[in-house]
């Protein structure tokens, strides 16, 4: 069996019935992996690289991950929280340093690290145009870290932003946690949430990550089902 350890925030984390239909990307990812792949979802709501490390969550992964495993590293949303010193990191300074700590954990145990940029928030202006992103500098920081540490980067940010721009305001609403009254017992009056995902959104963006991995060299691409099967779930062009 091959094991994926996934470190991240609420866009990745496991959700249960009390927050349904919210779904983390990692919860939907096994639709795209081969049968011998097992996912261990260590993502936790509200965590940044800093708080994840400070709470010893990376240390837990270090104790469990072994040679030949994979470490998916997906942060950015909460590293932006400039008014919260327990979470905030500077995108081109300690954010990169922290990402290096994740890489060290993987490589010290003989595992393969992967950086995944943040999924874009669904924020449109009154004219129906997607607003400038709050994630940009952290995406750049993660790409810098990828070059510095020689780690592959799956650019979910760009893929998700392109999808939102193409799909538009109204049609993209169903992928995010925008609830009408009565749709969820825990939010009887409804909810507007353009950061977190319903199952449809988690499945979509998990597929984008799978597509990105399938385009990498080994040992990454062999995690993913073949291109024809992948295309069944994604509206993408494929050569075979």
PLM regions with names:
Residues 17, 21, 53, 94, ...:
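Residues that cap or flank secondary-structure elements
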Residues 19-23, 44-47, 148-154, 191:
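Short, exposed beta-strand "edge-strand" segments with a Pro/Gly-rich flavor and a Y/T-containing core
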């Amino acid at each position: 069996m091959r094991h994926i350890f996934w470190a991240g925030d609420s866009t990745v984390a496991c959700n249960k019935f009390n927050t349904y239909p919210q779904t983390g990307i990692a919860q939907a990812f096994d639709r795209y992996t081969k049968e011998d792949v097992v996912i261990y979802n260590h993502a936790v709501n509200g965590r940044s690289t800093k708080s994840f490390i400070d709470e010893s969550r990376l240390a837990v992964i270090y104790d469990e991950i072994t040679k030949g495993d994979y470490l998916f590293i997906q942060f950015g949303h909460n590293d932006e929280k400039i008014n919260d010193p327990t979470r905030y990191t500077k995108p081109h300074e300690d954010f990169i340093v922290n990402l290096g700590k994740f890489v060290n954990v993987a490589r010290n145990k003989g595992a393969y690290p992967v950086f995944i940029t943040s999924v874009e928030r669904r924020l449109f202006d009154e004219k129906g145009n997607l607003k400038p992103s709050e994630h940009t500098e952290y995406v750049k920081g993660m790409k810098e870290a990828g070059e510095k540490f020689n780690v592959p980067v799956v650019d979910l940010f760009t893929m998700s932003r392109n999808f939102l721009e193409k799909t538009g305001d109204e049609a993209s609403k169903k992928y995010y946690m925008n609830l009408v009254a009565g749709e969820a017992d825990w939010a009887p009056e409804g909810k507007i949430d353009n950061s977190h995902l319903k199952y449809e959104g988690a499945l979509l963006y998990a597929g984008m990550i799978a597509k990105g991995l399938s385009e990498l060299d080994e040992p990454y691409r062999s995690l993913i089902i073949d291109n024809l099967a992948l295309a069944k779930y994604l509206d993408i062009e494929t050569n075979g």
